[in-house]
Curated annotation (Swiss-Prot):
Domain Chitin-binding type R&R: 41-114
Gene Ontology CC, one term: chitin-based extracellular matrix
Pfam families documented for this protein: Chitin_bind_4
Sample GO molecular function, one term: structural constituent of chitin-based larval cuticle
The keyword Protein biosynthesis is annotated on this UniProt entry: no
Protein name: Cuticle protein 7
InterPro entries attached to this UniProt entry: CHIT_BIND_RR_consensus, Cuticle_Struct_Prot, Insect_cuticle
S-S bonds: none
Tagged with keyword Repeat: yes
TM region positions: none
Highest taxon above the source species: Eukaryota
Keywords in alphabetical order: Cuticle, Repeat
Length: 145
């Protein structure tokens, strides 16, 4: 086959034999042994803060062992969450709301109360008599009004 290129060069398909690459071996570098290079672990950390002129804000930070994120409205109410790795290796997660009604939190690190409901308290005879006398006096006062 005779082939002519768009630029006017002509050649035969026999001259297009596949090129055979010779194997290449890389010699070890006499200067650096990659196995002997110590690489320090990288602790990537980031933080952010954005706020407008009326006080609304969003802010937080993240690194290898802890994170925090919060948003705040113009009235100062905040909603956020944070997490960290405890000394025991447990990931502690906390969500919170801070507003006019107080600080409200939910976390996997809070203690859990007992699941057994205690028996009701039974009044002693003296307490039962005092309650009855008190209620009798209350009814007498109500009758006068």
């Amino acid at each position: 086959d005779h082939i002519v290129s768009p630029h006017g060069f002509s050649y035969t398909s026999a001259s297009l034999s596949p090129y055979v690459y010779a194997p290449y071996t890389y010699a070890a570098s006499p200067y650096i042994n990659p196995a002997s290079v110590a690489v320090a672990p990288v602790n990537v950390a980031t933080s952010y803060h954005a706020q407008d002129v009326i006080g609304q804000a969003s802010y937080g930070h993240v690194d290898a062992y802890q994170a925090h994120h919060a948003v705040q409205d113009a009235a100062g109410n905040k909603v956020g969450s944070y997490s960290y790795v405890s000394p025991e290796g447990k990931v502690v997660k906390t969500n919170y709301v801070a507003d006019a009604t107080g600080f409200h939190v939910a976390s996997n690190a809070l203690p859990v109360g007992p699941t057994v409901v205690p028996a009701p308290v039974v009044d002693t005879p003296e307490v039962a008599a005092a309650k009855a006398a008190h209620l009798l006096e209350v009814e007498k006062v109500k009758g006068r009004v």
